Amino acid sequence: MDAEREPAGVRAPRRGTARAGVAVGAVGLLLAGCASMPDRGEVREVRASQGVDSQVRVFGVPPADKASPTDIVDGFLEAMTSDDPQLETARKYLTDDAAKNWKPGSTVTVLSAGLDRFPVQGDKESEGHRWKVTGKKLATVDERSAYQPETGGGRYEEYLQLVKFKDQWRIATPPSTLVLSESDFQRIYKPVNKYYFGDGTLVNDPVYVRQRSDPDSRMDPTTQTVQSLLAGPSKWLGPVVTTSFLTGTELAPGTKSLSLDGQNTLRVPLKLDNKAAHVPQSQCQKMATQLLYTIKDLTASRLDRVELQRADGKTTLCWVTRASAAPLANRVPSQVHQYYVDKDFRLVRMSLNVAAEEQQPQEKPESVPGPLATAATFKVGTAAVTYDEKRAAVVSEDGRGLYVVNMTTAGPMPPALLSSKGKLSAPSWDAHGDLWVADLDPQNQGLWRVPGGTGAPQKVDVAGLDDGRITGLKASPDGVRIALLVQKGDGRKNLYVGRIERPERKGDVSPVSVRELRPAAPQMADVMAMSWAPRGRLLVVGKENGGITQARYMLADGSMVAASLPGAAGLTGIGAYEDEAQPVVASSDEDGIVWLPPGAQWRTVAAGGRAPVYPG
C-alpha cells in the first residue's frame, strides 16, 4: 500500500511502510541495489519514526521482487512497526518456515533510538549471510505486558540469518520479540492500569496494550486489557497482590470487542471452568470491582456499572456500580485538607476551593489542632498526616527528632519516637497506618518503619540499594510500593520505586522489607522532590542533563512521561493526591506556597512556607 497524496515539504516513504491519511519520513534508510550480498558495508542506522501521531495507522510494504539483502533487513525491521493483522507483511520478509514459526506475541524490546545494522562475515560453510542488528536497549515488555526498564545501559544485539531461495533473499532467523524504537513503541502502545487487591485495597498494576486491535488476537484495547487482567498481575507486583478471579477464568471464546452500552454499562462474558462455575456472590462482586476500576481508568466515557455474564451472554453472574464497588475497593478518602509548614515553623492546614475564581479569597490556613497548636517553642521542619487526618508525624526543624502527635485532642508534646545524630527525611504514612522515615546520618543511614505509628522503630532492609543513600521517600496510597530518592557518589538524586513485602501471616515475625528497586524517572538526571499522584503515577520535580527544572507526571514503571506542569522553575517541594479533583500544591523559592487549579496558572497561598503535603 502506498502513502496517499504527499503533503508539501514532506517526503513520502520510498519503501517499508505506508501511513494512512498522512505521509511521513520513512523509518528505514532503504537502498536500491543488486541482489548479491556485499562483502563489506558500513554501519547503517534505521531511524525511528519521527513525529508520527498515535492516531496514524501504519501499514507495511512487502518486499520487492529480487530485493537486496539491505532492503530485506530494513523492510523487515520497519514492517515490525506496522498495524498489519498477524504482522503479515513482516512475515513476507521471512522464509516460509520462519514465517510459520515466528511468534513474538506480546513481548517487545524497546530501544532508545534507531537500530544500527550491518553485514557480518558468516561461517564459510553456512548458507546465505548474516546481518548484525544493534541498538541501545531501553526496556522490555514481557509476556504479561509489563514494562521492565533496562537498568544496566545494555546493548541490544541480534543476528539475522539471510538465505537465498529462487533468487529471493529472505530472513531465516527473526528476533524472538518485536523490536521497536521508543517513539514507535509510544505510537503503537498505550499504558493502562489493571487492578488487584493488596491487603484489602485495590492496587494499580501498569501494563501496555495496543492502541488499536492486536495483530494476533484482533482484540480491541478494552478487550486486551480485560484479558491481561484475567491473566494475573505482573511479575514485579505479583508477590504483594491477589486476584479475585479463580484460576481458569477466561473471556468467552470469540470475544474481540467490549464497549459500554447506552446506560454506561460494560458487560463482560466469561468462560468459567468447573471450579469457578459457582463462584460466591461476594467474590464475584470483587471480580467485577477489579474490572470496573480497570476499565474506568481506560475509557474516556463514564462507566457506571460492570456486569459479569456467563459465556452465553445471557446469564448474569453479578454486577457492581461505582457506588457499590467503592467500599470493596477501599481506596483513600477523597475529601482531605492540604498541609504545609508555614514561615513560623508551624504545621498548618487549608481546604482549597478549586471552583473559586482567581480573585475570590480562599479560606485562611489554620494551625492543626492538638499539641502542635499549643507547643509554642516546638519548630516543625517537615510533616506527614494520616489518611484519616487524626495524627501527624513531624520532624523537628533541626531534623534530629521524629514525633507523632494526635490532632483530635489537646495535650503536651510526646517524646520523640526516633532520634538521629544527623538528620531525618520527611516522614510518610502508608495505607496500613505504618510510618516511614529515612535516617541520613552517615553512621546510621537507612530506612525505618514505625508499625502503626506507635511501635518500636524497625530498620527496613532495602534490596538493591548498594552504595546509595536514601534522602527522601513517599509510601504509595495503596501501601504496597514506596518511592525513594537515592543519592549516590556523584551527588545527584535519582528516583526509584520498591515493592513493600510484609509478613504473610499474623504472628509472623519476619521483617517488612523493600524489594526490587526500579528506576521511576530515568529521564531525570537529578530529582529534587516527588509525590504520588492519581492512577499510580508520580509527580516529579527534577532536571534532565543540562536542562531546567521541570515538574512532570511520570509512570511509576519508569516507562514514559505522562504530562508536564507549567512554570516549574524554582519549585522545591510538591504535593499531589489520589483524587484527581484535588489540586497540586507546591513550594517555590520566590512565591512561597502555591497551588495549581485545573486549567489555570499557579496561585499563591502564602508568601512563606515549605514542605506542602497531602495526607499520606
Regions found by a protein language model. Name each.
Residues 2-13, 21-24, 28, 35-616:
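Bimodal "functional hotspot" detector
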